[in-house]
């Protein structure tokens, strides 16, 4: 069964990677799909994020990385995915994700949403937090995979 793990991943964190690794054990194929959102100004381009993720998941043979725009359910159908995987860090994530799952179910009744609780050691990590710490020159190696840490250091050089 194919699962889709969509997100902005700007940048991918160890929390995201935890969800990807666990989903890869549950499904025959996991597609990590980087959303191209024209309404947002990301730090990294979709192609840069795709490259970061590819390097971070190279050890997972059943994980593919792609980019997409538009409705997640339309992309899931196009790729033959039957499940949308979502990670939950804190209770407030559940509120937003449940609303999205209900909306997706209305749009595509054949798709299921699977919520995976992020490992406790990653429950505080968000892409926004990582960018803020990197911007202020703080340590990030415990928050993101090495290729991402390198890209962040290049983006926010210490002065």
UniProtKB/Swiss-Prot annotation:
> Top enzyme class of this protein?
transferase
Fetch the Pfam families from UniProt: CTP_transf_like
Q: Which InterPro entries match?
A: Cyt_trans-like, PPAT, Rossmann-like_a/b/a_fold
Which GO BP annotation is one of this protein's?
coenzyme A biosynthetic process
Q: What is its EC number?
A: 2.7.7.3
Q: Which GO terms describe its molecular function?
A: ATP binding; pantetheine-phosphate adenylyltransferase activity
Give yes or no: UniProt keyword DNA-binding. Answer: no
Identify the CDD domains for this entry. Answer: PPAT
Chain residues that bind ATP: 8-9, 16, 87-89, 97, 122-128
The site annotation (Transition state stabilizer) covers: 16
Cofactor(s) needed by this chain: Mg(2+)
Positions binding substrate in this chain are 8, 40, 72, 86
Q: Which Gene3D superfamilies match?
A: HUPs
Q: Which SUPFAM superfamilies match?
A: Nucleotidylyl transferase
Q: Where is this gene product found?
A: Cytoplasm
Query: Chief localization class?
Result: cytoplasm
Q: Can you cite an annotated GO cellular component?
A: cytoplasm
The annotated pathway is: Cofactor biosynthesis; coenzyme A biosynthesis; CoA from (R)-pantothenate: step 4/5
Keyword Membrane in record: no
Q: Which catalysed reactions does the entry list for this protein?
A: (R)-4'-phosphopantetheine + ATP + H(+) = 3'-dephospho-CoA + diphosphate
Q: Which UniProt keywords apply?
A: ATP-binding, Coenzyme A biosynthesis, Cytoplasm, Magnesium, Nucleotide-binding, Nucleotidyltransferase, Transferase
Assembly description: Homohexamer.
What the record says about family reads: Belongs to the bacterial CoaD family.
What does this protein do, in the record's words? Reversibly transfers an adenylyl group from ATP to 4'-phosphopantetheine, yielding dephospho-CoA (dPCoA) and pyrophosphate.
Would you tell me the protein name for this molecule?
Phosphopantetheine adenylyltransferase
The organism is: Synechococcus sp. (strain JA-3-3Ab) (Cyanobacteria bacterium Yellowstone A-Prime)
- Taxonomy of the source species: Bacteria, Bacillati, Cyanobacteriota, Cyanophyceae, Synechococcales
